[in-house]
UniProtKB/Swiss-Prot annotation:
Name this polypeptide is given: ATP synthase protein 8
Species: Neurospora crassa (strain ATCC 24698 / 74-OR23-1A / CBS 708.71 / DSM 1257 / FGSC 987)
A Gene Ontology biological process term: proton motive force-driven ATP synthesis
Stored InterPro entries: ATP_synth_su8_fun
Known function: Mitochondrial membrane ATP synthase (F(1)F(0) ATP synthase or Complex V) produces ATP from ADP in the presence of a proton gradient across the membrane which is generated by electron transport complexes of the respiratory chain. F-type ATPases consist of two structural domains, F(1) - containing the extramembraneous catalytic core and F(0) - containing the membrane proton channel, linked together by a central stalk and a peripheral stalk. During catalysis, ATP synthesis in the catalytic domain of F(1) is coupled via a rotary mechanism of the central stalk subunits to proton translocation.
Similarity annotation: Belongs to the ATPase protein 8 family.
Length: 54
């Protein structure tokens, strides 16, 4: 199993770091802002709805 051969440790650690860094960048730049905007718009709509019911 190549995962247990010490020769491959540096390679695995490097690619793991690259993949995690890439995923964090993609999530923070593209995916998460959409969810934040969606949440804020839903909150705003619910507050407007509450105001109109009074």
């Amino acid at each position: 199993m190549p995962q247990l051969v010490p020769f491959y440790f540096v390679n695995e650690i490097t690619f793991t770091f690259v993949i995690i860094t890439l995923m964090v960048y993609i999530l923070s730049k593209y995916i998460l802002p959409r969810f934040v905007r969606l949440f804020l718009s839903r909150t705003f709509i619910s507050k407007l709805s509450d105001i109109s019911k009074k």
